[in-house]
């Protein structure tokens, strides 16, 4: 979110009129022709930059101003601040400047980089960037002096091939590959020359080049890498660093099958095996084609970086650099091994040693992800056991570093990228869903899109029900993780720090450390499925965590649960068998009244339950008979109306829709009668008219659904018709009572009366009523009997109209 002042500035920039913009551009044009650059010039350019950047579409600027900005952009003598602003303005403005800027490219490194950024931003196809590409390649071929464009060529080239990978020809790919090898492997071993003060009476003098050192201060004895430390660096050392930064992208683009280089694709299998043996010998690497030689040198470079990462860094920044280099090196080695399996046997000793060194250090948790990726891709080739790696990854990382947002994102991306392989080959992937969901519980707002995509891969038949409970308990997990984090920070003896967290949090912290509640928290924080009870004492846990229900983290987590539930049910209904369907229905009934009490959370979850209750029963109508006892217990309790009316209404509706011998031959008259009697008792209880009665706290929709369901059941056991008709006849008195008239609108009361009257008339013709209200097992098209949750179908209204017009012919 922007601050109010910033929002105001952006709004002004978006709403500026065209005439005002043209006048402002004319003023800037005059300022740019002044000999000296004033503060007013810079301020005006900054404002113009805001104007052209604040809208999604490109703003059209006067052509003379655009040309002047291009001149500033190309001029190496202009202050860099003006070049930066000019580049940004031209990049966002109209008309495009691609062709005019490409016609005369500068050899000055700073100017060239700003011009290139505009060309890459405005290019519409590879032809637009072709002049820039040729200029770059020409600069790479020639040996330019220090300070010219070679230092900036590789970042620009990397961006270019990302957007237009097909732009380079085979010869150009080979040219760049050869240059990358030289920069990667043969950078100088001395520090760059630096100027030092010569004292008061003498001028500055050049310090003699000193040797480079490792991160631990030892003089470097091997070739230069990004982990070599110096006060200053030479041009080729900078190129070495740039090369390493882009080598992964280069290998992914031009070191795979089917790329522009056909030399390696055309070799026979014998030739390929020979080349692999040659590549295994570093001394023979010059015999290799450019791509294979680059692969070899990149592999050696990564091995050296992994060796260097074992050194104890003197500076914290170097420690962070070591971590980043490990991640990048293992990823590059993974790519190389994927292209040439002969490297797998050379890489695994190094990777295994690296894992052995890092797996116990949480500071290197992010480095475990590329290591796990390497094992996933190549452990079968090398016949190496990878169980320990994935056990570590799915158990320790989420449990102990759930609060690391970058690790959380990369972890979920790893799971998404490899979901199908993890399901098939990693036994504890699906078992670890309680741990995997900890990242979501802590970082819910930032990871919801990723988990929507990931969740289906976590659903397995043996853990599906537990996963559903875990999703419903996700806000409890967020609260428990919060308490775990606070408990680790504040010692039990430090009561002042506890009290600073607030009385509510302090009470929850106290409960978190109580031995009597330890089992509850151990369950909710469990690392894998199948450990502990599911919901035996869940209500107690909700009471303990009641004071955390307003925590922003818990509230945000609760908001993602309905989204995940939709994904879960949409996935599970495609693969669930009859047993699973029955279990799901029981969970819906049980958990509808066993949810963490967060504002709107219960209501939103029950809405999801209502939707998918109908879907489950439609897919498998015998569920109503299978779980008749539990459904009857639920429907017989008026208390469920007041706490979960929407879900209760849907339960009543599915009873009327699917409790029929048409769907299940086990549906006996006795079963129908028991349901009818229970629902009749509920309807009677909630519609009793007393003078002192308070207005009803339920909707008219519930009344109409109950009445319709009773009528449906009566048509399936005609002995029930008299008592149902009697019950329906009392609805007019209820609807016209004072408390109801005060609560419901005239339209609502008329709907209740009309519905009751139509049903009574319909039940006077049992055979017709059965046609209108009885379900039809077959047919997906329009059905006369089909009821919605709030109104009767057209067929019923038609029959009722006939009964009104011919009332003299009705049987008495």
Please identify what each model-predicted range represents.
Residues 1-812:
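Extended, charge-rich alpha-helical scaffold/interaction domains
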